[in-house]
Amino acid sequence: MVQTITYGREQEIPLKHPRETGKPSIFNDQKMKLGLFGSNCSGGLCMTDAPTTYEITWDHTKSIAQKADRLGMEAMVPVARWKGFGGNVNFNGTNFETFTWAAGLAEATDQITIFTTTHIPTVHPIVAANMATTIDHISGGRYGMNLVMGWFTPEMHMFNPSQLEHDERYQYGGEWLEFVERLWTAEGEFAFDGKYFQAKELESEPKPVQNPRPVLINAGNSSAGTDFSAKYVDINFASLDLEKMPDYTQAIKKKAQEEYRRQISTMTYGLVVCRDTEEEAKRDHQRIIDEGDWPGARHLMSIIGVESQSFGEQIEKFQERFIAGWAGQPLVGTPEQVVDGFQRLSDAGMEGMIMGFLDYNEEIDHFGAEVMPLMREAGLRY
């Protein structure tokens, strides 16, 4: 473990679980926590030309976040993107940078936990620590960081012509995060001496509102990814078939407890297409696929297949789910059917789901009016 040196002496800083602060809404006791995913970038979770009023403007993204906040949702999680995926629509190519996006939404909302998504190779730990702390103060302790190792090589080459091998990216990420955590917790000046980072006379003030640190999440599902999550983060987001979720959840919780003496929870993500009738829902879901950006999808899947072990052999099976939902869990149907889907996820060990919609600003109103009451009736929300 990298040692922190403070005023010439070694200092071990115990890291408590952020749940102990009781502040961020993502740690409340709702049985099925809810959030929005990808509402900062073009297409959101839909790689398609299907018609939508969704657009990347500040007023639009702020309206979406404020609606989620008023509904009592727990999380706003953005997608960090520096380069689109080409094809017909250049999926995610137009986007808001996530730290500044989160700072704005932190001021514009009241209770929802606002996340950044951080491609670790693109930002130095000193800069990341202070930016994160600033957002935590703006939000009053409602900030969280989604940690991504930088899997999209053409994008990462915009910053550095070399790309670390998959497992080493997680080693780099672990050291990066330990550096950030020391900046969040160390009192006085200290030195950091690691494999990837070396620095002296370090300090960072103020400290985050959350004690000892903000919420951390990660979506690594490979062996290296789950080990990183078990060791460092509070929530792991699983991109898996439903039947694999119970064993996955049990395994990662066991690893966190037995190897690192920590707690971790599991959540998932996906696309929700909820309509008044099943026929309408299936029709609109199929339209997303039929009008999908298949050249862009093939480009994306080939890159993921080669460069991200989190998906591996699942790529062909998830082909349509990349078009409609970024390979996440599809919940398609009437409000009752969507709630049944949430129930199945809960039964499989998922404590929450962050969602995308084809049309976030319009569909979240319908979700609030038709789905949320049924979730309360089902005991998934209160």
Describe every region a protein language model picked out:
Residues 2-108, 207-214:
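N-terminal beta1-alpha1-beta2 module of alpha/beta enzyme domains
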Residues 2-40, 66-69, 166-212, 239-348, ...:
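An alpha-helical appendage that flanks or caps ligand/catalytic pockets
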Residues 32-36, 76-78, 114-118, 143-147, ...:
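Hydrophobic faces of well-ordered beta-strands that scaffold small-molecule active sites
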Residues 34, 68, 72, 105, ...:
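Conserved, mostly hydrophobic/aromatic
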Residues 45-59, 117-126, 162, 210-223, ...:
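Active-site mouth loops of central-metabolism enzymes
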Residues 89-115, 172-176, 364-382:
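Alpha-helix-loop-beta-strand connector modules within alpha/beta enzyme cores
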Residues 126-128, 133-151:
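Hydrophobic or amphipathic alpha-helical targeting/insertion segments
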Residues 227-242:
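A conserved active-site cap/scaffold subdomain adjacent to cofactor or substrate pockets
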